[in-house]
Curated annotation (Swiss-Prot):
It catalyses: tRNA(Val) + L-valine + ATP = L-valyl-tRNA(Val) + AMP + diphosphate. One of its GO terms (biological process) is valyl-tRNA aminoacylation. GO terms for molecular function: aminoacyl-tRNA deacylase activity; ATP binding; valine-tRNA ligase activity. Belongs to the class-I aminoacyl-tRNA synthetase family. PROSITE patterns: AA_TRNA_LIGASE_I. This is Valine--tRNA ligase. CDD domains: Anticodon_Ia_Val, ValRS_core. Its EC number is 6.1.1.9. It comes from Caenorhabditis elegans. ATP binds at residue 645. InterPro entries: aa-tRNA-synth_I_CS, aa-tRNA-synth_Ia, Anticodon_Ia_Val, M/V/L/I-tRNA-synth_anticd-bd, Rossmann-like_a/b/a_fold, tRNAsynth_Ia_anticodon-bd, Val-tRNA_synth_C_sf, Val/Leu/Ile-tRNA-synth_edit. A motif ('HIGH' region) lies at residues 127-137. Residues 37-57 have a biased composition (Basic and acidic residues).
Length: 1050
């Protein structure tokens, strides 16, 4: 993932070095500050500064915010000496909420009569009420909130709509596990109504926690519009949608194969199926079995041919399903079996069943024996063959995973016990032909960990072909944008081959299907297919009327049974973008906020949720649900592993925000649903990754880190150390604003003005204003393009490298000097940069930006009339264009290169505390003029006593005993070392360092040249060896050059 300074991933070693560099820089700045203070007149030192300096001698205590909830935070006192995330984050959110800043109506107060076309809507992807939010939710919420805040500050009527999803199967499983663990009960012990009461209790408990987490993350949502997918208005919308789609024929009932979890006794969706890839024989734990079950093998057995001594050998990975076989298929071109086509096989265990041998081109002649057993009721491919060949369908596995009646001696056995029993019985009959390893994929239920069985069930389906065509067309013609664009291929591939959607689930928790099965009071025969005896209705009375009309009988003759199944969770969540606004009613909110602007979510549910929202919206409203689909990558741990509770690497965003000890982190594992072995593994993983726990980072640092990781299309390997690095960035912001506040006062020369006196501004003032203008332009462009990595990079670089490292350091002599005109300009520029910079980062880091912005003095301009930064105007590119100065920026870029080289030379000679004199010999008159303009910057940032700019004709003025640096062919830099260093001693010291590095290089070279190095040493270790060697060789080159220079001084 890219970081604010570049695009290459940073190693832990690099992050550590970066932290050390930051610490050194902080020390350097402090020394510079003290030196400047000594030189300044005592009377010019503000009382505040003296007090702050005194406080720095002791460790600062975290202040406590005592502002009553909902009131504007009290920040009248002096700014605290250090940045404390908890203190900064307290108070603001409740005030924002109470003032109504998050409500779309707030913009109407500011701009009465604003155009509804300026509305901007984001519906939060509703998290499941199965537990707390994880860091993946934090990423999504941060991205969505950043977009919302950015548009709000641009004056749009924004709505970020919150909510939670009932998550049918996931929530039911969690509650069932808790009931079993805590009270030893099953849902069947309670019954449907009492069990659902337990789930509602869970929802109320977890929903409050989830909403509190959203608040902690700074989500600027309109809480008055929060929706739960089982709220009455959602229930009404779901019922209405089902009935309309059923009556139009889009929803229908059919007997088809479904993904069946025997442990849950329910069909599950494709997204709830995990796929275990096996390379061969593997033992897998299956719920309900004491011993692990073997998978990844191909068993072969023979069917005898009726009326013949011949046999045909078939192979299968699920030999127990031979009890449901309906036939044997061979390829029409397979000469080995042509004479058997049309004949019958004898089933060895079910004498009444003969199996036809037939030709079908789907058979792969080279796989196994080339003959395939066909089990239409338990295999998706076989189902299609069974339909095509008109074969009978034999269910051999029951809903709870037992062998069905009618399967001979195996009836009533557990399915995998029958697997072993069938093999033994085949051996006894001389029909078993052995087994071999077979790479395969085993589908398992993500909720119960059970092995999925394809089972034939009458279910409700949605016809998807026509909706999929419209969804593909919407993307193709540009009405619907997918970002990043490479996901379009996935969109098209899925939708162009989409199957009808099974929407019924055999659960108790969820939207009960508004359909009724019709039978007759007189018990008459019902000859039509089962699907013909269903009606959908809002009430039982309506169903009765519909049934009577359908069969032209009196209502008194009708018996109704309400379908006990519930709808797939994706059905109700597929209606989320419009049902939350009151559909099917034509509400004001529907008019203002639907369709939405953008849908942001993970790419893993592009088909399962996003496509279905497009389906449902177009089908029921005739509109697309949103204009853009923004997809983020998956978050993994720092090692690139998928986050899993059993690995102990799932990160709770609140733990990162507040910090947590290792003991408390591990204690959390005991409150989950992990078994003892999983807890032990998870604890080991946590101890390895977080030996000292997780440090307090604060929400602004977490948000900024997550946004910096969002390089489009890449998985995110989240490293908490990096998040903590951004807490240090927050501290940098805090300290620079604190520095500015100590120097701003009501004195004319220390009071900032909105209009800056550019004629009196120094080149440094003009340069930082140009850099500010560029930051405003690039941040606006990045956020409009959803390029959050670029937005964090631009703002980080401006604040840290341009403003703090260069501008603030350079103007310190001006602020402590006697020139009141220059001081007043510097104060105004300082204020302008801080105010603008805080507004730039407000959507990204809302808490620290509000805290610091509120502490800054307000100026006489419309930009400063807003009560809060979150409703202030975002910096507009056109307002800052007047400050752009490419020529000056190029000059400073050159100066920074020169300063870097001088600092490196100072480090080589250990001149940390020594003032130097420097001469710069320019090659051209233009460069001489440019260097004279920026000499003050060079003087300050190289810690020089004096810097002289010479032209190339003045080389005779170069002082003897000077070290030399060439700078890009444009100038030569000379640093006078006479009397500053002990040359022989320095040569000796550098010689020792040179020898040490040469020994290290030789050792690495010897290791690399060993005979088995390429074969035995992993690629990543070899890369590290080469990197270390290259670094040492570069150091050797620099030391050698330094020694040569020192010798020349003698």
């Amino acid at each position: 993932m890219s970081d604010p300074a570049g695009n290459r991933p940073k190693t832990e070693k690099e992050l550590k070095k970066e932290a050390e560099k930051a610490a050194k820089l902080a020390k350097f700045e402090e020394k510079q500050k003290k030196l400047a203070e000594k030189k300044a007149a005592a009377s010019d030192k503000p009382v505040k500064e003296a007090k702050a300096k005194k406080e720095q001698t002791v460790e600062a205590a975290e202040p406590v915010d005592q502002t009553p909830t909902g009131q504007r935070k009290k920040i009248d006192g002096e700014i605290p000496a250090a940045y404390f995330p908890g203190y900064v984050e307290s108070g603001w959110y409740s005030w924002w909420e109470k003032e109504g800043f998050f409500k779309p109506e707030y913009i109407d107060k500011l701009n009465p009569g604003s155009n509804p076309a300026d509305s901007f809507t984001v519906c939060i992807p509703p998290p499941n009420v199965t537990g707390n939010l994880h860091v993946g939710h934090a990423l999504a919420t941060t991205v969505e909130d950043t977009i919302t805040r950015f548009n709000r500050m641009h004056g749009k009527r924004t709505l970020f709509n919150p909510g939670c999803d009932h998550a049918g199967i996931a929530t039911q499983v969690v509650v069932e596990k808790r009931l079993k663990r805590e009270r030893g009960l099953t849902r069947h012990d309670l019954g449907r109504d009492r069990f659902n009461q337990e789930v509602w209790h869970w929802k109320n408990e977890k929903g409050d926690v989830i909403y509190d987490q959203f608040r902690k993350l700074g989500a600027s949502v309109d809480w008055d519009r929060a929706v739960f997918t089982m709220d009455p208005k959602m229930c009404r919308a779901v019922t209405e949608a089902f009935i309309r789609m059923h009556e139009s024929g889009t929803i229908y009932r059919s007997n088809r194969l479904v993904n069946w979890s025997c442990a849950l006794r329910s069909a599950i969706s494709d997204i709830e199926v995990d796929k275990k890839e096996l390379t061969g024989s593997t033992l897998i734990a299956v719920p309900g079995y004491d011993k692990k079950i073997e998978f990844g093998v191909l068993n072969s057995f023979a069917y005898k041919i009726q009326g013949s001594d011949e046999e045909i050998v078939v192979s299968t990975t699920r030999i127990e399903t031979m009890l449901g076989d309906s036939g044997v298929a061979v390829h029409p071109d397979d000469q080995r079996y042509k004479h058997l086509v049309g004949k019958q096989c004898i089933h060895p265990f079910i004498p009444t069943r003969n199996l036809p041998i037939f030709a079908d081109s789907f058979v792969e002649m080279e796989f196994g024996t080339g003959a395939v057993k066909i089990t239409p009721a338990h295999d998706h491919n076989d189902y299609e063959v069974g339909i095509r060949q008109n074969l009978p369908f034999h269910n051999c596995i029951t809903d709870d995973g037992l062998i069905s009646q009618g399967c001979g001696e195996f009836s009533g056995m557990k399915r995998f016990d029958a697997r072993t029993a069938v093999i033994e019985a085949l051996k006894e009959k001389g029909l078993y032909r052995g087994k071999e390893d077979n790479p395969m994929v085993v589908p398992t239920c993500s909720r119960s960990k059970d092995v999925i069985e394809p089972i034939l069930k009458p279910q409700w389906y949605v016809k998807c072909a026509h909706m999929a065509e419209k969804a593909v067309a919407a993307v193709a013609n540009g009405d619907l944008q997918i970002i990043p664009e490479f996901h379009k291929a996935t969109w098209n591939r899925w939708l162009e081959s989409s199957r009808d959607w099974c929407i019924s689930r055999q659960l108790w928790w969820g939207h009960r299907i508004p359909a009724y099965y019709i039978s007759f009071a007189d018990g008459r025969e019902q000859p039509l297919p089962e699907e013909n005896y269903w009606v959908s209705a809002r009430t039982e009375q309506e169903a009765l009327a519909k049934a009577a009309q359908k069969f032209q009988v009196p209502e008194a003759e009708i018996l109704l049974k309400w379908d006990e199944d519930v709808l797939d969770t994706w059905f109700s969540s597929g209606m989320w973008p419009f049902a939350v606004f009151g559909w099917p009613d034509a509400t004001k909110d529907m008019d203002l906020f639907f369709p939405g602007a953008v849908l942001e979510t993970g790419h893993d549910i592009l088909f399962f949720w996003v496509a279905r929202m497009v389906f449902m919206a177009q089908e029921l409203t005739g509109k697309l649900p949103f204009k853009e689909i923004l997809l983020h990558a998956m978050i993994r741990d720092a090692h690139g592993r998928k986050m899993s509770k059993s690995l102990g690497n799932v990160i709770d965003p609140l733990d990162v925000i507040r910090g947590i000890s290792l003991n408390d982190l591990q204690a959390q594992l005991l409150g989950g649903n992990l078994d003892e072995k999983e807890i032990a593994v998870a604890k080991e993983g946590q101890a390895r990754d977080y030996p000292d726990g997780i440090p307090e980072c604060g929400v602004d640092a977490l948000r900024f880190a997550l946004l910096s990781y969002t390089s489009q299309g890449r998985d995110i390997n989240l490293d908490v150390l990096r998040v903590h690095g951004y807490r240090k960035f927050c501290n940098k912001l805090w300290q620079v604003v604190r520095f500015a506040l100590a120097r701003i006062s009501d004195k004319p020369e220390q009071k900032p003005t909105f209009e800056i006196n550019l004629k009196s501004a120094t080149p440094t003032d003009l340069w930082i204003l140009s850099r500010l203008a560029k930051a405003v332009k690039e941040t606006n462009e990045a956020l409009k393009a959803y390029n959050f990595t670029q937005a964090t990079t631009v703002t980080y670089n401006f604040w840290l490298y341009d403003f703090c490292d260069v501008y603030v350091e350079t103007i310190k002599p001006v602020l402590y000097g006697d020139n009141t005109t220059l001081r007043q300009v510097a104060i105004s520029v300082l204020h302008k940069c801080i105010d603008t910079g805080l507004r730039l980062i407000s959507p990204l880091m809302p808490f620290i930006s509000e805290e610091l912005w509120q502490r800054m003095p307000r100026l006489d301009d419309s930009d400063y009339t807003s009560p809060s930064i979150i409703v202030a105007q975002y910096p507009l590119t056109q307002k800052y264009e007047k400050y752009q100065n490419e020529k000056l920026e190029a000059a400073f870029e050159f100066a920074q290169e020169l300063i870097g080289k001088v600092r490196s030379l100072r480090a080589d000679y250990d001149l940390k505390k020594t003032k130097i004199t420097m001469q710069i010999l320019s090659e051209t008159p233009e460069d001489e003029s440019m260097l004279n303009d920026i000499s003050a910057v060079i003087t300050t940032l190289t810690f020089s006593e004096k810097v002289s700019i010479l032209n190339k004709c003045e080389s005779d003025k170069i002082e003897k005993g000077s070290a030399h640096i060439a700078c890009g062919g444009r100038c030569q830099v000379y640093i006078n070392l006479t009397g500053i260093i002990d040359v022989p001693k320095e040569i000796e010291k550098l010689g020792a360092k040179l020898q040490k590095n040469q020994i290290s290089v030789k050792k690495i070279g010897d290791i690399q040249s060993s005979a088995d190095y390429e074969q035995k040493v992993p690629v990543d270790i070899r890369a590290l060896d080469q990197e270390k060697k290259a670094t040492l060789e570069k150091e050797i080159e620099n030391i050698t050059a330094a020694i040569a220079q020192l010798k020349a001084l003698n």
